[in-house]
């Protein structure tokens, strides 16, 4: 039997960030509980990072950690710490101190290189990739029901009820009303899309980037829409 060495590799995850302006536990608990109530399965044991850049005083990170875990999230770290003392307190509570995703150092501009000598043109015949048929569900998806299209798209010829969940590794097409949760690009495909004839969703998610019902544009509720990722944010357009 061949033994494989342990490896340390870099990768990218989408993690929810909770921005707090004070350390009052009850307000934070109410916010997290409200989000979980909207999509309990989606947020169950979900990793969470707290942005503390608005805080002037050092919060009780041990208390915050217990509070977050009591609402079925997993607190993995903080971001936006303004002082070394705050970073030290977070580390003492077993939390990671993470840099803000928006701040990046300017990268040096590459110097132009001489144009390479053109390589000889070799004709390569394209080999078509094997097609994976979409998973088609005929009829409504009822509350508490979950459909998953592994490695392909999902087509629903009916409506998705509140409390129901439709998931696909590729795109989701709903020929009816979407009242439940739609999770496209479940394995990280940013090109996945969501289509529905009437939008009333509890949650929309593409490749880990999500939007809850309270953040949906009012003008697009009960409208036919097309959802896609645009610059790492969900963009919802009306289908004309």
Swiss-Prot record:
UniProt-listed InterPro entries: CAP/MinC_C, MinC, MinC_C_sf, MinC_N, Septum_form_inhib_MinC_C
Disulphides: none
Swiss-Prot/TrEMBL GO biological process terms: cell morphogenesis; division septum assembly; regulation of cell division; regulation of cell septum assembly
Gene3D superfamilies (alphabetical): 2.160.20.70, 3.30.70.260
Domain of life per record: Bacteria
Pfam family, one: MinC_C
Keywords: Cell cycle, Cell division, Septation
Subunit composition and interactions: Interacts with MinD and FtsZ.
Assigned protein family: Belongs to the MinC family.
Function (record text): Cell division inhibitor that blocks the formation of polar Z ring septums. Rapidly oscillates between the poles of the cell to destabilize FtsZ filaments that have formed before they mature into polar Z rings. Prevents FtsZ polymerization.
UniProt-listed HAMAP family: MinC (MF_00267)
Name by which UniProt lists this protein: Probable septum site-determining protein MinC
Gene: minC
